[in-house]
């Protein structure tokens, strides 16, 4: 759910009448966001923190409060972009430098474009639908083969409710929500490629599923639990926090890994349907000289647990782990439009041990990104 800052809408403190500066900022930010989106979309053909498949959307943690609430009977549409390039391999929290030295790094280039439509049913209750679209590529440094996947991801239908009536809660509030993850995304995108990478002899064409980290779909249903809250610390500083957890049905999605089935590690023969989560927090400060502009800073923690919340089955191949990132962001509101952007740098990455890893006494690796780029545009009507 894309949330909006209480320090922006209906703000009466520290406003400026410098309309020329406002127009310049509006044009500059609009051009900047459009340029970023074009560059990111053209740089590669996902939801994911590299190989571990933590799929969280655009920046969504900005607080909602007095004047920033969506009025009953009104809609808002948000289009968000997430971009990252994952190539640094970790086993646990140990960086595998030899992968770079040997040029065996696996590189995932990911773009996730999400469209979210929210309807404010009552002052406290809102309904939403979230439609992601994935563009992703994957290749190994020492191989000419490049895999790609594009398509609609898994859809989320949800409802959110404020604990307190927002009209009477200008200083703090908490929203909780429930939703359902619908497996509308394809979890079995296949590529045809030449497996003869020696450059000698005739081509050997192979058709097989791409790695699950760039598949648009997860292959299973899920229960979405989310929350968002804020606390005004003073007239110019607001603390915000939010998170979500997607508890899936578990088991496997039936998509086979590799050309042949393993007899030594049968639990890894098929792809697991994994849970995922996101936690974030931060502070927001208005930029007093420009009406509608504010800056944010805070950390994010997103990842895939080794074991699902519902104890159905943890069989199947997954790359569990998490990445903690932190960085600055910004939000600009003009009329019925809101622009947000953020750049988050990794401060801790950890590829944890999966359930099959614990059974077979192994510990696989995963590729992580150094930076995550987020941007969104929201229109209210």
Please place each PLM-identified region on the residue numbering.
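Outer membrane beta-barrel transmembrane domains
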Residues: 90-101, 251-381
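Short loop/turn motifs that connect adjacent beta-strands in outer-membrane beta-barrel proteins
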Residues: 49-52, 65-74, 86-88, 124, ...
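Transmembrane beta-strands of outer-membrane beta-barrel pores
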Residues: 81-87, 131-137, 163, 180-186, ...
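Sec/Tat signal peptide C-region and signal peptidase I cleavage site
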Residues: 43-48
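Surface-exposed strand-loop-strand hairpins of Gram-negative outer-membrane beta-barrel proteins
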Residues: 51-54, 83-112, 213
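Outer-membrane pore/translocation modules
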Residues: 135-272
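Residues that define the transmembrane beta-barrel architecture of outer-membrane proteins
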Residues: 73, 109-113, 149-155, 172, ...
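Residues on the lipid-exposed face of transmembrane beta-strands in outer-membrane beta-barrel proteins
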Residues: 65-67, 79-81, 115-119, 129, ...
